[in-house]
Amino acid sequence: MQDELVWIDCEMTGLDLGSDKLIEIAALVTDADLNILGDGVDVVMHADDAALSGMIDVVAEMHSRSGLIDEVKASTVDLATAEAMVLDYINEHVKQPKTAPLAGNSIATDRAFIARDMPTLDSFLHYRMIDVSSIKELCRRWYPRIYFGQPPKGLTHRALADIHESIRELRFYRRTAFVPQPGPSTSEIAAVVAELSDGAGAQEETDSAEAPQSG
């Protein structure tokens, strides 16, 4: 297995694999030290009015507030094209199939939609997954000081921004949880959060200036 991680986040019209649609997918590849490789990719796919009108109110409000619904309506990208765009980016940094684990937050849900709609992408990834949410849950039980000191989550509910948050969160756990006991003090945890937050602000500015086109 290689050291790269493939981070993916998806936005859907809901969580029902039987009826809901995949409408946005973003991907970033990192090395073993969680350094981001390349610019990443963020693709919004078209969905028809029937799919969008079937969203429950909370999801419809979330995607309206983020601007995603308008982008979905305007998009001409289908699932096959989006899958090819994501694979083109990943192939720049991961040369061998089935070597790079999928990483993200609550990633099993995303992978289920990927397996349904983008089987070539799914089969390219290693079967193992790195779910940052699992580390969060373990910290809540074993290291509450770290859990309650974690960086605040954003509320953009957009795929690329969510990946950046997930990477930042794993960087946080690497520096606070994956260390010899007794671990960092409360003030040391706060210092890590402040440093990571400063970096996140700079990254958001870069994303805004150089966001990949959706097609």
Swiss-Prot record:
The active site is at residue 127. Disulfide bonds: none annotated. Gene3D superfamilies: Ribonuclease H-like superfamily/Ribonuclease H. It is an enzyme of class 3 (hydrolase). Its main location: cytoplasm. It is found in: Cytoplasm. One of its GO terms (molecular function) is 3'-5'-RNA exonuclease activity. GO terms for cellular component: cytoplasm. Keywords: Cytoplasm, Exonuclease, Hydrolase, Nuclease. Belongs to the oligoribonuclease family. 3'-to-5' exoribonuclease specific for small oligoribonucleotides. This is Oligoribonuclease. It comes from Mycobacterium tuberculosis (strain ATCC 25177 / H37Ra). The gene is orn.
